[in-house]
Amino acid sequence: MNKFKGNKVVLIGNGAVGSSYAFSLVNQSIVDELVIIDLDTEKVRGDVMDLKHATPYSPTTVRVKAGEYSDCHDADLVVICAGAAQKPGETRLDLVSKNLKIFKSIVGEVMASKFDGIFLVATNPVDILAYATWKFSGLPKERVIGSGTILDSARFRLLLSEAFDVAPRSVDAQIIGEHGDTELPVWSHANIAGQPLKTLLEQRPEGKAQIEQIFVQTRDAAYDIIQAKGATYYGVAMGLARITEAIFRNEDAVLTVSALLEGEYDEEDVYIGVPAVINRNGIRNVVEIPLNDEEQSKFAHSAKTLKDIMAEAEELK
């Protein structure tokens, strides 16, 4: 039974990621109503005007307005992009203490409005902050989603598509684990235009080194972009829009998001990037890909990395 009826999104955090996400929603007419909240109310005012001026060219009418936490009471989806930004040379996990404090305040304000929808978390370190949102909100695990490795998987598919000269949508390959340095590719189930990657590499052995380099490029892409222009935002904004679309269209789409594991992949009590079925009620279920021994070992290491960080976080004790 689908609980939610409308398509109202409240966006908290109107920085580079948040404003790019807002534009993606309006451009694609994914929502009926978009409310934007940020401490910088003047920037929100300007962005709301700018987005409204774009709506005559969007496929359908989208209502856009500046708001406050009380607007969350009837929202279907609250998307959190607020938090301290990642600095050059700083890992996503370095951000944890600063952003946990911010999230405790944000989630408390949202829940005080009697919010009863779905949370979508984008702020880094996203796996830990999705877990924190679940803990702070008291909502069922199905209704707290992190953006996880949706962007990493997109980068991975793009680079593989370029290597094999096919469209990215013809590549089925996932990055799982932490959205960060311990993420891993699921080579054992990757396929290009329906052909197993393993089979293709047997036909062109020289491609093995290229494939390994593709993962390195995928993993380190954010650092390269941050070094070049200070932040990444277009890719993750489109990923967030894709998750939003899957929710509101009740798609049962499989996307690599950060979800709570309760025995899947032999892990417990951790939010981490895995394939999951997304529909109007949030996460329907986690999809367990049979990993080979090496992949399982790397995934366990990734989960342990996140758990070790959370164990040190005073805000989660």
From Swiss-Prot:
Annotated active site? H179 (proton acceptor)
Domain of life, source organism: Bacteria
- Spell out the subcellular localization from the entry: Cytoplasm
EC number per UniProt: 1.1.1.27
Binding, substrate: Q86, R92, N124, P125, V126, D127, D152, S153, A154, R155, T232
Q: Which reactions fall under this protein's catalytic activity?
A: (S)-lactate + NAD(+) = pyruvate + NADH + H(+)
Q: Provide any one GO MF term from the record.
A: L-lactate dehydrogenase activity
- Residues modified as Phosphotyrosine: Y223
Span of the secretion signal?
A: none
GO annotation terms (biological process): glycolytic process; lactate metabolic process
Give the record's keywords alphabetically.
Cytoplasm, NAD, Oxidoreductase, Phosphoprotein, Stress response
Q: Which InterPro entries match?
A: L-lactate/malate_DH, L-lactate_DH, L-lactate_DH_AS, Lactate/malate_DH_C, Lactate/malate_DH_N, Lactate_DH/Glyco_Ohase_4_C, NAD(P)-bd_dom_sf
| UniProt-recorded name of the protein | L-lactate dehydrogenase 1
Origin species: Staphylococcus aureus (strain JH9)
